[in-house]
UniProtKB/Swiss-Prot annotation:
HAMAP family: Ribosomal_uL13 (MF_01366). GO terms for cellular component: cytosolic large ribosomal subunit. This is Large ribosomal subunit protein uL13. GO terms for molecular function: mRNA binding; structural constituent of ribosome.
Length: 144
């Protein structure tokens, strides 16, 4: 019996919608990353993108445990000398709530071209509305 290896053009990709309301950020992000990679499928192949499309709604209502709401910091560099910028979870959630989930999931995906391809299948929206109704996404429940 030969080992099965999935081919990129033969993989069936489904669309799922996840409601992030009152979900813990890390637990939500790990399940999303797992689904984007395709590890939940029997035909998972490490060097092929076998994952599904994930739509995350209500990103503004995601929660963190402990004191991370005030103390967790996000950093980025502008590219100019002395250009390190920092923002707390609280400020980033007010300014750009989708960025929090995007950064959490992106850090859990491979850091290579295949990981970037997987990341493109993630769609995050701050509110409960999304423009992907034509894809008929299924509701995905993520337990706490």
């Amino acid at each position: 019996m030969k080992t099965f290896s999935a081919k990129g053009n033969e993989v069936k990709r489904d669309w799922f919608v996840v409601d992030a309301s009152e979900k813990v950020l890390g637990r939500l992000a790990t399940e999303i990353a797992r689904r984007l990679r395709g590890k939940h499928k029997a035909e998972y192949t490490p060097h092929v993108d076998t994952g599904d499309y994930i739509i995350v709604t209500n990103a503004e209502k995601v929660v963190v445990t402990g004191r991370k709401f005030k103390n967790k910091m996000y950093h980025h560099h502008t590219g100019f000398p002395g250009g390190i910028k920092s923002a707390s979870f609280e400020k980033l959630q007010d300014k750009n709530p989708t960025k929090i989930i995007e950064l959490a999931v992106k850090g859990m995906l491979p850091k290579n071209p295949l990981g970037r391809e997987m990341y493109r299948k993630l769609k995050v929206y701050a509110g409960s509305e999304h423009p992907h109704t034509a894809q008929q996404p299924k509701q995905l429940e993520i337990e706490e």
